[in-house]
């Protein structure tokens, strides 16, 4: 073992240790280039191959960098998702509003790219410059001044500047109150339709004006319901009188200083139990302001006694009694008028809820006709005349009829005598003929009498039918208007038996022929039987009155003789004794029966 510890540096130059000189001398090959080539050729098999660590175990710093990169990518994806959800797309830069409105072909606004694509830098698309579109943010407009109706914040006003303002308001209403506006209201298409009850949804009204409206609306409303969930306010206004949508919108827009476009106004659903419960239970909320008594339609849908009344089954006899009392015999009139009673009549509500309404209407009308026909047949002619004129309202003068008969040159005493036997329906005295030139008032005189005494009219135009004389079976008095020569031939051939006052067989539709006597019959015609020798057998059966003079009118085309229901009522009252009509005290007190007809088990003075 050498005793020297290290390299001898005594012969080294200044500044150098001389170590490299010794090591260079120990090398087998002094050529530096050959040494480097040999080093690279040997690779890992060389003596210095252990200097490079080839283990698969990664350093701790590389794993942390990978985790950081993954977290960054996940965070970027979440940010892009939030941008898609909450950010509104940018509008395309607009050069001019007028220029944008003059597009020849429909343009499509570019959508904002939410996910950014990173360019590798290796290739560039040739159309990359064409796809670039400059995007700008559309600045929000300043809020409109209060004088123009815009009192909401600028944010609210900008939200409402869209194509469908109503859809935005409906959405905000549902978000605020948790119920759809259309579930509480029914639609009025016309702004002129009047209604007492209105549901109003108002957007972005000032709180101080809403508080003031609570007092201002009390003078207009019988009931007021108000609840506010900013920025929406909900009103239920039951006005003293009916108002149209235009009137209500003007009232609320001026009172709350809001634009009419920010108001939804429709009438409430008055037959919906769910809607009524919304208002009823809402009024118990301390945040709801309520003034006045509940409207009738809320009470009807929510109170217990009304609900028990609705459960009552439909009673047809009650409907028939109502139609009989109202003197309704037509199906359409019965159906319409009875449906209008649904708000106040439990049986009418049960009728509307039934699936066989048409069947019940037909049966009701048929039964009323049966009762009316039986009532008429049970009355004498005196009782029938008294029954008819007692229902005529208003005052008239009997002298209008007398003056008209004298104007036509008739002897009133003779007319009164023939009219008396006519009403008595004596054989061969039960038919009167009123003839004369046109426009002499024949039909007007006869029709006014038929209307006052509720007579029936038959027309020879229907003579081809076997049932054209069927209305005579339901009449106390009848009229055959404007008989022509063909009609007289038919009467002479087939109706002489009926004019004699004998029983005849009358064809009835869907029924067997009816055995009956003709009621008193008035015939109007332009043909005088006295001058016609072709009908000698009718001369003794028909008494003729001639109207030779044209009916007079004044300068305003108003008839000079008032032949009205009131005139005929006065005529019969004045000449009741001369016509030998029976005293009504013998048939009943004041010409009426002691008790009205009853076809249902209804209560009378608390008794059934």
UniProtKB/Swiss-Prot annotation:
Residues 410-560 form the SF3 helicase domain. GO terms for cellular component: host cell nucleus. It catalyses: Couples ATP hydrolysis with the unwinding of duplex DNA by translocating in the 3'-5' direction; ATP + H2O = ADP + phosphate + H(+). ATP binds at residues 436-443. The modification Phosphoserine is found at residues 88, 96. One of its GO terms (biological process) is DNA replication. InterPro entries: Helicase_SF3_DNA-vir (IPR014015), P-loop_NTPase (IPR027417), PPV_DNA_helicase_E1_C (IPR001177), PPV_DNA_helicase_E1_N (IPR014000), PPV_E1_DBD (IPR046832), PPV_E1_DBD_sf (IPR046935), Rep_E1_papillomaV (IPR016393), Znf_lg_T-Ag_D1_dom_sf (IPR037102). Its main location: host cell. Residues 148-311 are annotated as: DNA-binding region. Pfam families: PPV_E1_C, PPV_E1_DBD, PPV_E1_N. It comes from the Viruses. Its EC number is 5.6.2.4. A motif (Nuclear localization signal) lies at residues 83-85. Keywords: ATP-binding, DNA replication, DNA-binding, Early protein, Helicase, Host nucleus, Hydrolase, Isomerase, Isopeptide bond, Nucleotide-binding, Phosphoprotein, Ubl conjugation. It is found in: Host nucleus. The keyword Oxidoreductase does not apply. Coiled coil: none annotated. There is a cross-link at residue 517 (Glycyl lysine isopeptide (Lys-Gly) (interchain with G-Cter in SUMO)). The keyword Disulfide bond does not apply. ATP-dependent DNA 3'-5' helicase required for initiation of viral DNA replication. It forms a complex with the viral E2 protein. The E1-E2 complex binds to the replication origin which contains binding sites for both proteins. During the initial step, a dimer of E1 interacts with a dimer of protein E2 leading to a complex that binds the viral origin of replication with high specificity. Then, a second dimer of E1 displaces the E2 dimer in an ATP-dependent manner to form the E1 tetramer. Can form hexamers. Interacts with E2 protein; this interaction increases E1 DNA binding specificity. Interacts with host DNA polymerase subunit POLA2. Interacts with host single stranded DNA-binding protein RPA1. Interacts with host TOP1; this interaction stimulates the enzymatic activity of TOP1. Belongs to the papillomaviridae E1 protein family. HAMAP family: PPV_E1. This is Replication protein E1. It comes from Human papillomavirus 22.
